[in-house]
Amino acid sequence: MSSHITLIKTNTNNENKMTQFNYKVDNDVMIIRAMVNNVAKQMTPVWPLEKFIACNALHGFESMSFEEAVIQNQTAKKGTPFNEKLERVNWHMIKWCGSFLDIGQGTLEMPHRDKGLYFGFLKLAPFDSALHQNSKSIKSWLSNLPEMPEQAIRLCLDKLGVLNQKQEDFLQSTLSHLPGWAGYIKWISEWKNRNGKEENPVSLVDFIAVRLVITCILWPEASQEEKKKKKDSADTKQLIQNIKNKEDDYRQLLLKKLLPELSKAHIKENRANAQMVFCIDVRSEPFRRCIEKLGHYETLGFAGFFGLPVSIKDYDGETIKDSCPVLLKPRFNIHEKAIAANEHCLEHHEKGKEFKNILNRVYQQLKYNFSTPFALVESLGIWCGITMFLKSCSPIFARRLTKDLNEMICPSIQTQPVFELDLLEKEVGISLQEQIAYAEMALRLMGLTDNFAKLVIFCGHGSSTQNNPYASALDCGACGGNQGGKNAQLLASILNKIIVRRALAENGINIPQDTLFYGAQHDTTTDEVEIYHSNVSQFIHQDILDQLRTDLNMAKHNNNLERINYLNSIDCAEKDIARRSTDWSETRPEWGLARNAAFIVAPRQLTKNINLEGRCFLHSYDWSQDKDGALLETILTAPMVVAQWINTQYLFSTIDNVAYGSGSKITHNVAGKIGVMQGNASDLMHGLPLQSVMSHDDKSFHEPQRLLTIVYAPREIISELVEKHDVLKTLFFNEWVHLVAIDPRSHLFYKLEKTNNWSVIQ
């Protein structure tokens, strides 16, 4: 069976001419598409550097048990012999992918990008002498390739002599040679393009078609290559056993710490002076301990996007950033507006911004143009030399000087989110009813429905580093690799509205009239906390706010002392940590989420008196306020899944940093502003760098182990939720995540086995 699509185009002049285009969409094409879809299921998407998202390197193998997936992949990746022809194919493929996918680093844009990768290759390959070596027969063959990539794949499979029953395996192998570039294309087609058509369309069908054409030219006997004998999996089994031993030891230690807290009577405390809601990020845990010790403060844990699926356009930015988990699609567009002390300040800022933008554009054009970089160096060499000297010898002073110059040229101004629904521009803003609904859901999910403090601070987080392509990996994963302060500011602004509070009161959430909500941001590199004022129209409790600022500075100092022990520094804690955030040669500004091990869903009282060593994601939850399990359902299917992605990324980047990580930062090259390569031509690296998980070349800092999820709730509620969601059954029964329930009534620990039975942990 086959179908034909015929398009008839009639000339506008009087000539009776007709151009007919025939595109044959036959069974072969559909079969090729189906095969590509099947092999793509095992590919892990690779996010770009600007929104570097943690992802399980073996995400496509989660239908297997953890052990099976690791054994299969470790065995396949180890012991691959060097193949010169394969390396040549890879080199050409990297060249074409880098040119097509570039987003601004290259001087000249690849022609025909708007028609797709395969189409562009089809038109340009005959001019690539490095590929065809000026062979007339190869050039002729290239010029006569079919226009549909599926047809090109069929042609190449036949030319390479791949048997029908082995074609899918061959395509799988084709993708596996450059999983980074293929994974990035998968991200474009399956994640980025969810919101609309891509300007430069590309798919894995294009990728495979181009690669097979190159393979036909450079490695025609590829299908005849003997498969290497699989290595004995004994080493991998020993690796898995070591992981299990670490998991058992850690679970025993953690449950031993929690056990005494279960028997304590948790009396509801008097009204706190301030409540601070932090992201569940493991880096928040030690800081929460520090601030709680300094005053009558209460802290809670909640996903750092604060329940708001928004896209935000910064006031001074040109791009719109999705500030929510990648599992969600943004529902609302939010813009920022300036709040200047007077018209003169705003005018000064705008003129300074325009001047800086002009300088930046000129500099970028001179830097990336193929004919001007040397002239740029000659003209600015002395100033660049001075800058390099200051940045290298005194990074803190250089940062302060740069900040002062920026303030002189373009003085900073306060901004606030514009979130009211714009009747003239309906794509911007959130309706009142939706503001109320999202505010209520956020408060219920974080367990903050009564006993409000006088000050409630929603504290997002971000990092501050220099010369760091992986900067977004240190920002908030729940905000899509962006900083979370603006989400915090937005929720605070909504909850400060009287009309929203009245509606919440009708739904049983009574917020005292003297309670004020503030947005804030925790810098995880330096531990500084900035509290925003633009969302507050009245200033009361100034004494509490001043004391809180003082205590936050002390908490910063205390947490710096705790963190410096892991950074192997002999300098003053605060001085060294400040240097790390400003030093452009620093390969490890902070440890990020290294050593993450557990995800605890429970009231803060259960963990408040325990030093969890910055290894636990903490999500506030009170099962007594969630009889139907709806809140727990959201927590397990959203924040916990994100935590599992983070955990597995750190795990696999540690056990094999070459295969699953990105190697040393020292030899990184940024490719097309989308990712990094090792050297000048490698696969697009898709995991964490060596310095993020290893304290030395041969000693890991991160302890590779699967995520341990601990839920303080009755087993029957948890079991119902697991049965309801395939993603939970996959993670728990295939043992990608371990689940322990703490019975609130008997205080016994239960482990969910892969057989879907609960066993008591003694």
Swiss-Prot record:
Membrane topology: Peripheral membrane protein
Pfam families, alphabetized: DabA (PF10070)
Binding-site list for Zn(2+): 279, 281, 461, 476
Keywords: Cell inner membrane, Cell membrane, Membrane, Metal-binding, Transport, Zinc
InterPro entries hit by this protein: DabA
GO MF entry, a single one: zinc ion binding
Signal peptide from the UniProt entry: none
Cell compartments where the protein resides: Cell inner membrane
Cellular component annotations (GO), alphabetically ordered: plasma membrane
PANTHER family cross-referenced by the UniProt entry: INORGANIC CARBON TRANSPORTER SUBUNIT DABA-RELATED, UPF0753 PROTEIN AQ_863
Subunit-structure text: Forms a complex with DabB.
Function: Part of an energy-coupled inorganic carbon pump.
Family of the protein in this entry: Belongs to the inorganic carbon transporter (TC 9.A.2) DabA family.
Name of this protein: Probable inorganic carbon transporter subunit DabA
Taxonomic classification: Bacteria, Pseudomonadati, Pseudomonadota, Gammaproteobacteria, Legionellales
